[in-house]
């Protein structure tokens, strides 16, 4: 229906190639998957979890910051999930009772929600297809997911997927279009916030802006460090330059940008 208003096109089980579903089903069956289990028990190992949390640090911090910044109606009966690129849960958010329920059914940091471990669900689908996915109640393989509708979208910036953002909501039979539009808006807001807090993304955006002022590649590098509040000496040793060279480059940068001190420079770029 009207679910894809200005948003990504959601992949559903219906518009999936039947051959793909058959392949998935046989893959799931080979793992000795128990559709009737009352809680998910598959977790990432300690080492694997430590590794994925370390490499997804920026993403997790951005997610938690976005949640804290609020304007997201958390009294909503929804559970938000952030996973790494393979579907391992990195962070969860929602009302205390939703989080409590999630824990009871085994959804917490480290839970595997990918296809072999959790059957067909929106997170598993999005991980496989790298596309926004929507799975309704009864379409889930796991009985414990059948009272939920799940939606999931890749968190991508500059052509690279960093992880996945999922929403589970209790479904009275069918998710209404209004609900879907809401969730889509919600996911969009979170994705933008996450991208905004991603240093890589910020670095590229800053780089473009420095370029617009005609800064040379070396000046751009100095400007990056300066924007991170590094001192002249620190920048000099990092770049293998004399401090006096860095100082004169900073003067040049100010001239090109049209600012006269560090405060103005910071305000100009960190607004």
Question: Across the structure, where does each feature detected by a protein language model lie?
Answer:
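Intrinsically disordered, low-complexity terminal regulatory regions
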Residues: 1-111, 125, 227, 263, ...
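Sensory/regulatory domains in signal-transduction proteins
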Residues: 85-91, 95, 105-197
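A cross-family signal for key residues in well-ordered alpha-helices
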Residues: 124, 184, 224, 237, ...
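Regulatory hinge/linker segments at domain boundaries
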Residues: 198-218
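Strongly charged, low-complexity linkers/loops
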Residues: 210-216, 223, 227, 244
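Pre-recognition alpha-helix immediately N-terminal to the DNA-recognition helix
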Residues: 220-221, 264
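Recognition helix of helix-turn-helix DNA-binding domains
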Residues: 229-264
């Amino acid at each position: 229906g009207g679910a894809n208003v200005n948003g990504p096109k959601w992949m559903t089980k219906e518009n999936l190639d039947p051959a793909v579903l058959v392949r998935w089903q046989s893959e799931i069956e080979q793992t000795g998957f128990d559709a009737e289990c009352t809680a998910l028990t598959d977790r990432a190992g300690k080492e694997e979890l430590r590794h994925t949390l370390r490499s997804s640090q920026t993403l997790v911090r951005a997610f938690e910051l976005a949640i804290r910044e609020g304007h997201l109606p958390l009294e909503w009966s929804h559970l938000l999930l952030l996973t790494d690129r393979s579907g391992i849960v990195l962070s969860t958010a929602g009302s205390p009772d939703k989080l409590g329920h999630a824990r009871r059914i085994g959804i917490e940091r480290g839970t595997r929600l990918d296809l072999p471990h959790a059957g067909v669900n929106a997170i598993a689908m999005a991980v496989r297809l790298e596309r926004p996915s929507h799975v309704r109640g009864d379409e889930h393989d796991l009985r414990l997911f059948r009272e939920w509708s799940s939606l999931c979208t890749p968190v991508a910036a500059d052509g690279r997927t960093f992880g996945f953002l999922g929403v589970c909501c209790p479904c009275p039979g069918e998710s209404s279009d209004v609900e879907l539009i809401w969730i889509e808006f919600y996911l969009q807001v979170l994705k933008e916030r996450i991208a905004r807090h991603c240093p890589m993304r910020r670095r590229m955006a800053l780089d473009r802006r420095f370029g617009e002022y005609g800064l040379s590649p070396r000046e751009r590098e100095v400007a990056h460090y300066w924007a991170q509040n590094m001192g002249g000496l620190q920048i000099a040793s990092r770049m293998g330059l004399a401090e006096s060279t860095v100082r004169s480059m900073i003067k040049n940068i100010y001239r090109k940008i049209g600012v006269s001190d560090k405060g103005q420079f910071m305000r100009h770029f960190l607004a």
